[in-house]
């Protein structure tokens, strides 16, 4: 009798994706982040669903409904903090996953890479809208500032902003539609993740050497399922430590004050995972220029396949490029720090220098370094 998992139309798909999938025999731990992102997405959808059962998307009751979840709902505090800190874990893994892609040259899988960048934009939009929902001070003012950026678009800007707000300011209509979008987007993200995997399985996985590994493949199960479970255990431990010991470590104290349109917080800033982009936005004195630079700072990821001048795919055997990539990582950490600082003398200059160096490293230094390495290797 033939095996059901190999013949059943539905189970067959799962079998070809997670069980009998031929994978390179020597991919590093860095390749674990994809599966962890999948787990994070499922966690976010489940916790979000339970939160939505108790949350009310109305300006008068949104803040108190979140308080009610934390105080009165069975394990509501756990669900709420798992959702909030789960989002932080999601972004940590997203950035690691992108970094891994840059290090090993995975961006040469054009379709997989491009849908990945679109996924990043979608996840960022979802996280931003989720941050607005508790209707605290930072939620309200964050929503006001970020949506207001669209007014920089010539001609249609102001009309577009009012259309998104559903009025002349961030109010009940804005909160209701943000809740609707925040609810539907994770399911769209799930569909896009499936397309992401579909494109990946068309070409097969990359590996640290960057060479073709068709001659040396092993089944995904049990080798990589066990490896993924190890990553899952480490993630669960970290997330539980965060939720149970310091749930508000990555949050903003201002969000424990209900939204007040008459009182602006001294420093408006988004969640920590957007700070690098926020720092780039603030470092440009012009509004439209800042918005364009903000979009380009993420969109530039799509340029990597075009900017790849090296004869080798991976950075494993390219020490100079490795060095530059780590400088880029340090630069992004500096930008994240600057994004959380007030707009004052030393921070403005540091932010501007870090923003310029961010674009210079990617657009100029990395391609030139790759060409130099080609020359040194006599290629």
Curated annotation (Swiss-Prot):
Q: Which SUPFAM superfamilies match?
A: a domain/subunit of cytochrome bc1 complex (Ubiquinol-cytochrome c reductase), Transmembrane di-heme cytochromes
State how the cofactor is bound.
Binds 2 heme b groups non-covalently.
Required cofactor names: heme b
- State the compartments where it is located: Mitochondrion inner membrane
Matching entries from Gene3D superfamilies are given as: Cytochrome Bc1 Complex, Chain C
Q: Where does a ubiquinone bind?
A: 201
Give the protein's biological function.
Component of the ubiquinol-cytochrome c reductase complex (complex III or cytochrome b-c1 complex) that is part of the mitochondrial respiratory chain. The b-c1 complex mediates electron transfer from ubiquinol to cytochrome c. Contributes to the generation of a proton gradient across the mitochondrial membrane that is then used for ATP synthesis.
Similarity field: Belongs to the cytochrome b family.
Keyword Heme among record annotations: yes
Share any extra remarks: Heme 1 (or BL or b562) is low-potential and absorbs at about 562 nm, and heme 2 (or BH or b566) is high-potential and absorbs at about 566 nm.
This protein's name: Cytochrome b
- Give the bilayer topology: Multi-pass membrane protein
Cite the PANTHER family for this sequence: CYTOCHROME B
For this UniProt record, the keywords arranged alphabetically read as follows: Electron transport, Heme, Iron, Membrane, Metal-binding, Mitochondrion, Mitochondrion inner membrane, Respiratory chain, Transmembrane, Transmembrane helix, Transport, Ubiquinone
GO function terms (MF aspect): metal ion binding; ubiquinol-cytochrome-c reductase activity
Where does this protein hold heme b b562? 83, 182
Q: Which residues cross the membrane?
A: 33-53, 77-98, 113-133, 178-198, 226-246, 288-308, 320-340, 347-367
Annotated Gene Ontology cellular component terms: mitochondrial inner membrane; respiratory chain complex III
Q: Which residues bind heme b b566?
A: 97, 196
* Complex and partners: The cytochrome bc1 complex contains 11 subunits: 3 respiratory subunits (MT-CYB, CYC1 and UQCRFS1), 2 core proteins (UQCRC1 and UQCRC2) and 6 low-molecular weight proteins (UQCRH/QCR6, UQCRB/QCR7, UQCRQ/QCR8, UQCR10/QCR9, UQCR11/QCR10 and a cleavage product of UQCRFS1). This cytochrome bc1 complex then forms a dimer.
